[in-house]
C-alpha cells in the first residue's frame, strides 16, 4: 500500500527525532533475512535500548539531513535498517555485529558516531566500547590492583629493612 504525503512526513519526523537523541547509528542491509529472525532482532533491540527502523531510503535521507548522521546518506541502497543507540554508543553496533555473525546474509554497511562516518570494517571501534558500568568496574579493578601492589611493595621494603638491621 502506498504511503500518503502525511504518512511520509510523520515517518521522516519520527526518524529525525530518533536521530537527534541518538548517540550513534548503524546502517545494515537486511536482504535475505527471514521475518522471524528480524522480529527476534527487533525484540532484542528493544531490550537493549536500541531504536531499530526499517525506512524507505528516500525518507531516511530526508530524516537524517541536519543531524550528526547525515554522513550515512550514501549507504541507503536496497533494504536498509537504521539502528540508533540511545543509551550507550556501542549498543547498536554490538547488537548488529552479533546478529551478522549468526546470519550470513545480513550485512552491516557502515556507522556514524559524533558526526564521523566509520566503515563497516571498523565496526569493532564502537562495538567493543565498554558500557558505563563496565568502564567503572575496570577503573575500580585498576585502582584496587595498584593499591594492593603498593601494600605488597611497602611490606617487602619493611621486611628488607628489618633483615638489614638484624644483620
UniProtKB/Swiss-Prot annotation:
UniProt GO cellular component terms: large ribosomal subunit
Keywords: Ribonucleoprotein, Ribosomal protein, RNA-binding, rRNA-binding
One of the protein's GO biological processes: translation
GO molecular-function terms, A-Z: large ribosomal subunit rRNA binding; structural constituent of ribosome
CDD domains: Ribosomal_L10 (cd05797)
Database matches in InterPro entries: Ribosomal_uL10, Ribosomal_uL10-like_sf, Ribosomal_uL10_bac, Ribosomal_uL10_bac_type, Ribosomal_uL10_CS_bac
Keyword rRNA-binding: yes
Top-level taxonomic group: Bacteria
One Pfam family of this chain: Ribosomal_L10
Keyword Transcription regulation: no
Family: Belongs to the universal ribosomal protein uL10 family.
Role summary: Forms part of the ribosomal stalk, playing a central role in the interaction of the ribosome with GTP-bound translation factors.
Quaternary structure and partners: Part of the ribosomal stalk of the 50S ribosomal subunit. The N-terminus interacts with L11 and the large rRNA to form the base of the stalk. The C-terminus forms an elongated spine to which L12 dimers bind in a sequential fashion forming a multimeric L10(L12)X complex.
NCBIfam families (UniProt xref): PRK00099.1-1
Entry protein name: Large ribosomal subunit protein uL10
Organism the protein comes from: Psychromonas ingrahamii (strain DSM 17664 / CCUG 51855 / 37)
Upper classification of the organism: Bacteria, Pseudomonadati, Pseudomonadota, Gammaproteobacteria, Alteromonadales
Name of the coding gene: rplJ
Amino acid at each position: 500500500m502506498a504511503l500518503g504525503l502525511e504518512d511520509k512526513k510523520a515517518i521522516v519526523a519520527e526518524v529525525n527525532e530518533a536521530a537527534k537523541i541518538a548517540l550513534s547509528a548503524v546502517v545494515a542491509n537486511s536482504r535475505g533475512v527471514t521475518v522471524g529472525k528480524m522480529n527476534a532482532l527487533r525484540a532484542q533491540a528493544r531490550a537493549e535500548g536500541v531504536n531499530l527502523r526499517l525506512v524507505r531510503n528516500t525518507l531516511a535521507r530526508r530524516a537524517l539531513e541536519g543531524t550528526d548522521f547525515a554522513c550515512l546518506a550514501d549507504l541507503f541502497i536496497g533494504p536498509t535498517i537504521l539502528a540508533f543507540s540511545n543509551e550507550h554508543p556501542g549498543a547498536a553496533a554490538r547488537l548488529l555485529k552479533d546478529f551478522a555473525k549468526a546470519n550470513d546474509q545480513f550485512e552491516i554497511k557502515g556507522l556514524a558516531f559524533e558526526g564521523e562516518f566509520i566503515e563497516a570494517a571498523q565496526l569493532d571501534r564502537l562495538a567493543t566500547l565498554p558500557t558505563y558500568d563496565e568502564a567503572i568496574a575496570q577503573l575500580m579493578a585498576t585502582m584496587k590492583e595498584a593499591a594492593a601492589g603498593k601494600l605488597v611493595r611497602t611490606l617487602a621494603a619493611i621486611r628488607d629493612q628489618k633483615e638489614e638491621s638484624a644483620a
